[in-house]
Amino acid sequence: MTMARDLLVKNATIVDVITHSTYGGWFTVRDGSLAEVESGAPSAASESSASAVVDLGGAYVQPGMLDIHMHIESSLVTPRRFAAAALPHGTTTILQDPHEVANVLGGPGVRWMLEASRGLPQRVYTAVSSCVPATSAEIETPNASISPAEVTELAREPEVIALGEMMDFHGLIDGDEHLAAMLRAGMEAGLTLEGHVPSLTGPDLSRYIAYGIRSDHTLMTPAKLLEQLRKGMWVMIQEKSVTPAVVSTIMGLPDRSRVLLVTDDVMPNRLLGGHLDRIVRRAIDTGWDPIDALAAATVRPATYLGLHTLGTITPGAKADFVVTQALASYPPTQVYVGGRLVARAGALTVDSIPAPEPAPIAGLVEEFDANAFDAADFKFGAHAGGVGDAVSGSPAGGQAERLNVRARVIEANDENSFTTLAERDVTLEDGVPVDPGLVLATVIPRAAARPGAAPYQPVMVLIDGLGLTTGAYATTFAHDSHNIFVTGRQPATMATALTAVLEAGGGMAFAPDAPAAEPRGQVSLLRLPLAGLLSDEPVATVAADFDTIEASLRHAGMQARNPVLLLTLLPLSVSPDFKVSDKGIVDVQGRRVLTPVAA
C-alpha cells in the first residue's frame, strides 16, 4: 500500500537521543508528524509518493530543542519577537513562566501572555506563576496577586501544563497556607509543580519536595545536585551552573535521565547570539558527552513534562527537527516545526510570525508624574530609614553637610546575585557617602502612582561591590515585583535617570554625571512600554539599546559579566541573602526588613 507523504528527508545522519547513537537514514513527514524513520536509503517508490524530497547530503538531524524553564520577559520582548529570534537557534518548544508580567498584572497578565503566544510557529506552553507576589506585603509593596482559584481557572487553557517555580521556599516550609493552597490547586489541575531552591538542604529540602514539587533550576554545586537527585528531583542546569565540577559530577552518574538543560533568563543581546543551543554547546565544551547534552535539551525535558510526542526523531513524534552540518554544530542550517521549514541559516524563512501587534497593556508606570522625584529624595537619610540619632558632625560654614552614621551596607559581587550585609561607620557629605565604593539605591513602588495614593518618600540603601563609580541607572524591570529600582552615586543623576524612565512609560535608563553648572549628558534609554517590561520591537533593535546601556554601566565601572541582570536582581526579595525593597533592606533568610541605619 502506498502512503502519501508530505515530505521525505534522505541522506540524513540521525541523532538518536534515546540510544545515544547516530545512524544514516531517512524519514517522512505526514500531517505534521514523523511517519517512517528508517536507516539506509528510501526506495524509489517512497520518494515518488512524497510531495517534497530534501536531500541533506549527510548532514545531522537532531530533535528540536525544548527549553522548559524560561521567562520570555527576560529578553524584554513580546512572545512573537522572542519566537522570531529563538527559532533560528533550534528552540522549537518552550515552557514559559510569565511571572514578570504576572507580578505586575496578576492573572490577566498571564492570560495576556497566553494570547500573545498563540498562533506562533514555536510551540509555547505556559506555567501559571505560583508566587505572585513573590513574598509578603510586609517585605515589599506588591503590584498584583494570583489566587488558587485563578490557578484552577487558568489551568483550563490547553497550553497551561505547569505551576511556575515556588520561589518563597521559606514561607512554604514554615507553613504558609496560601502557598500550600496554590500547590494543591496546581496538583488537582494536573499541573507539573516547579521549584526554586537556592539554599535548602537536609530536612528542609525534604519538606519542600514533599509538597509535590518536582524540579529545581537554581545555581548548582556537585553536592546540591546529588542531594536533589537522591531525593527524586529533576535537576535543571542553566548556563551559570555549567562548570567543570558540575559537569564532571553529571558525567559520573550512571543515570542522567533527570538532568536537563534550560536557559531561565536570556537578555536580548545574548539571544541574538544563541538560545538553548548556546547552553548545549557550552556543556559539550565543558566535558559533557555531546549526545547526552542533546538528550538533556530534547527527550528528557519532554519526558519531564509528559510531552511524549516531542523531543525525539521517532515515528509518531511531531516533526520538529534541526539540521546541523556536524554534531551539535550551531547555529543550525535548517529548523523545522511540524514538518514546516521555519528557519534557515540563522533567519526565519518566511514571514511566519503573526503580523498583528499584541494588545497594549499598562502597568501604572505611565501614571507617574515624570518629575515627581528630585535630587533631595535620593539623599541617604532624606526620608524613612534615615539617619535619625545615629549621626554626628555638623556642617562648617558654607560647606556641604558632613555626617557620620552607623549604616547597614549590602555587599554585592561581580560573580553572582548572592549578597551579604555588614555594619559600617559611613561618612556622608550632603547625603552622599564619601567612600567612592558605596552607591545609593532605592525601590519606588508602582503603587505610588495609583489615584489617591499618598506621596511616596524613597528609602535609601547603601550597596558596596557594584563597581559603579559614576552615573546612575533606573529601571522598571526589577525582579520580582518590578517596582522601580534606581541606583547611583549622585542624587541629581539618579533623578535624571528616573525621569527618563517615567517619561518613556517604562524601561531602563543610564544617566551620566555632570557638574552642577552644566546640562546633563545624553541619557541612554531602552523603552519598555508594555507594562514597563516589554517591547514589541525586533530583538535586534532592543538589543542595540540594551548594549548601549550595558556599555555605559561598564564605562561607569561595573565589571560584572551581565551588569544589567545583576542590577535587576538586587530587588529580588527571595534571593539570598540581603536585597533592596521599598521598605528598606530585606533579610531574606530572616523574612524581615532592616532599616538602612543600624540601631
Please identify what each model-predicted range represents:
Residues 1-25, 29-30, 87-89, 271-287, ...:
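Active-site microenvironment of metallo-dependent hydrolases
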Residues 6-7, 63-65, 93, 161, ...:
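Hydrophobic "anchor" residues on beta-strands that sit immediately upstream
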Residues 12, 32, 58, 69, ...:
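Divalent metal-coordination and catalytic microenvironments
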Residues 39-42, 98-101, 129-130, 168, ...:
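Short, ordered loop/turn segments at secondary-structure junctions
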Residues 62-69, 96-99, 127, 164-166, ...:
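Active-site neighborhood of phospho(di)ester-bond hydrolases with catalytic His/Asp-centered motifs
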Residues 80-192, 517-520:
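Divalent-metal coordination cores built from histidine and acidic residues
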Residues 145-165, 171-237, 241-261, 271-292, ...:
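Histidine/acidic residue-rich metal-binding segments in metalloenzymes
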